Amino acid sequence: MKILTVFMIFIANFLNMMQVFSVKDRFLIINGSYELCVYAENLGEDCENLCKQQKATDGFCRQPHCFCTDMPDNYATRPDTVDPIM
């Protein structure tokens, strides 16, 4: 019985650590919409700087949008949507 208890505590701690160390790769969202990089001259540099401002580790242009690596967990997964007026 002790072995089962120790194993369950180990699993609980392991799952808790996995949640802390999880990171996300996301398309960059600024002002509620995806950031376009299609027509920019310095595609890689602009996306990299914008992503780092959002606390990502790196960014690049994955046309037509900027793509950021290792985004914070609380970063939006979708752009803002507006309900249509009826």
Curated annotation (Swiss-Prot):
Entry coiled-coil feature ranges: none
CDD domains: neurotoxins_LC_scorpion
Keywords annotated in UniProt: Disulfide bond, Ion channel impairing toxin, Neurotoxin, Secreted, Signal, Toxin, Voltage-gated sodium channel impairing toxin
Gene3D superfamilies membership: Knottin, scorpion toxin-like
Organism superkingdom: Eukaryota
Annotated signal sequence range: 1-22
Tissue expression: Expressed by the venom gland.
Pfam families to which the protein is assigned, alphabetical: Toxin_3
Keyword Secreted listed: yes
Keyword field contains Repeat: no
Subcellular location: Secreted
Gene Ontology annotations for the cellular component aspect, listed alphabetically: extracellular region
Domain LCN-type CS-alpha/beta: 24-86
Outcome after substituting N74D: In mesotoxin-2
GO MF term list: sodium channel inhibitor activity; toxin activity
Principal localisation: secreted
Role summary: Binds to sodium channels (Nav) and affects the channel activation process.
Entry text on domains: Has the structural arrangement of an alpha-helix connected to antiparallel beta-sheets by disulfide bonds (CS-alpha/beta).
Name this protein carries in UniProt: Mesotoxin-1
Upper lineage: Eukaryota, Metazoa, Ecdysozoa, Arthropoda, Chelicerata
